């Protein structure tokens, strides 16, 4: 039997805990170390909750792994092959830099970095490294979004005329999310998912026009954006809305509506993961999707990439970096109430 890849996870918030659960389901890897600056997360006496059912269901209680209060100590463990970085966004760059310097493969949670300047530095590090690195933009692997991308690219229902994405919830609370300088507000921490998928699916927009307002993070916590593609009759109308200013008890809304020449797709996250197709002359149809969440599929893809000997897909990584440039343009658009061109 071939040697298993050894994984170390830095950060045991909702995403780190979710990743921990997922690795236990994947052949060829095993988690041998975890790190968090909060002792109670390491010993299992506390854990973070996620937005979506199925996130962070397991835990560290009874887990036989090395535990570190400092993520840099985990990176210096010579037995570790993969470093999974799930710390605060403002810390992504320093941990990615350190892990690549130690020749570790790196999976880094979204967004790739706190700023586009930091993201560009990560791209340069990746270009020089023999290690693999992936930005964990989970919508690229989420079954309903995979289905949508294929429907657009293959014109399954004819030309795509319009796309609208929504991602809304109540304020998550806590010190990290209360500090825009760390998290980037809902604009960067939450809304980035939809901006990235638009970039991934349709390519870099030419410009954006955004409106929004500040919230409990001290930064932009509710945003509505129109993405402008200067391709006459070639690109759909594209918009998205992201917010964590909803009142307590609202829940989590993750949805999209895609209108095509010959059909309308409507997705709303729920227990059944239902994607509805509406067409003239037909009864609405529920489309059965592949079971599972994007988190699992992205991690499986990363592990497979390493085990197969493939190198980092720099195009996909660069796309994740440019997503941050789009988000920063959205921020400027809100502040100036103007259309802002994307500069990369």
Stretch-by-stretch model annotation:
Residues 1, 29, 82-84, 304-344:
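C-terminal helix-rich "cap/oligomerization" subdomain common to oxidoreductases
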Residues 1-61:
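N-terminal Rossmann-like dinucleotide-binding module
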Residues 19, 62-125:
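Beta-loop-alpha module in the N-terminal Rossmann-like domain of NAD(P)-dependent dehydrogenases
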Residues 108, 133-135, 240, 267:
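Hydrophobic residues in well-ordered beta-strands that form the structural core
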Residues 121-138, 159-163:
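Rossmann-fold dehydrogenase core element
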Residues 139-217, 337:
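Predominantly a Rossmann-like dinucleotide-binding segment in NAD(P)-dependent oxidoreductases
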Residues 195-274, 299-311:
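Contiguous beta-strand/loop segments that form the cofactor/metal-binding neighborhood of enzyme cores
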Residues 288-300, 315:
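Active-site loop of classical SDR/Rossmann-like NAD(P)-dependent oxidoreductases
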């Amino acid at each position: 039997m071939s040697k298993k890849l050894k994984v170390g996870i830095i950060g045991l918030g909702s995403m780190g805990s979710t990743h921990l659960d997922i690795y236990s389901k994947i052949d060829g890897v095993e988690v041998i170390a975890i790190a968090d600056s909060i002792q109670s997360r390491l010993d299992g006496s506390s854990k973070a909750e996620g937005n979506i059912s199925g996130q962070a269901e397991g835990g560290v209680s009874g887990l036989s792994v090395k535990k570190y209060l400092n993520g840099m100590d985990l990176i210096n463990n010579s037995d570790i092959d993969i470093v999974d970085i799930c710390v605060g966004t403002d810390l992504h760059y320093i941990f990615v830099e350190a892990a690549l310097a130690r020749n570790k493969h790196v999976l880094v949670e979204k967004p790739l970095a706190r700023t586009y300047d930091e993201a560009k530095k990560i791209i340069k590090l990746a270009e020089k490294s023999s290690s693999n690195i992936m930005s964990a933009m989970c919508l690229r692997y989420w079954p309903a979004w995979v289905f949508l991308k294929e429907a657009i690219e293959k014109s399954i229902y004819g030309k795509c005329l319009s796309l609208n994405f929504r991602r809304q919830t109540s304020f998550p609370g806590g010190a990290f999310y209360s500090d825009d300088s760390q998290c980037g507000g809902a604009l960067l921490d939450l809304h980035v998912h939809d901006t990235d998928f638009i970039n991934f699916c349709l390519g870099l927009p030419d410009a954006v026009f955004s409106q929004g307002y500040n919230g409990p993070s001290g930064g932009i916590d509710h945003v509505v954006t129109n993405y402008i593609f200067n391709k006459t009759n070639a690109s759909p109308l594209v918009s998205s809305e992201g917010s964590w200013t909803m009142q307590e008890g609202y829940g989590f809304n993750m949805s999209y509506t895609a209108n095509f020449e010959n059909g309308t797709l409507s997705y709303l996250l729920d227990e059944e993961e239902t994607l509805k197709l509406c067409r003239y002359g037909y009864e609405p149809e529920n489309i059965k999707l592949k079971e599972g969440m994007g988190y699992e599929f992205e991690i499986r893809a990363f592990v497979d990439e390493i085990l197969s000997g493939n190198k980092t897909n720099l195009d996909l990584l660069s796309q994740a970096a440019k997503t941050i440039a789009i988000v920063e343009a959205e921020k400027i658009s809100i502040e100036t109430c103007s259309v802002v061109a994307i500069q990369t």
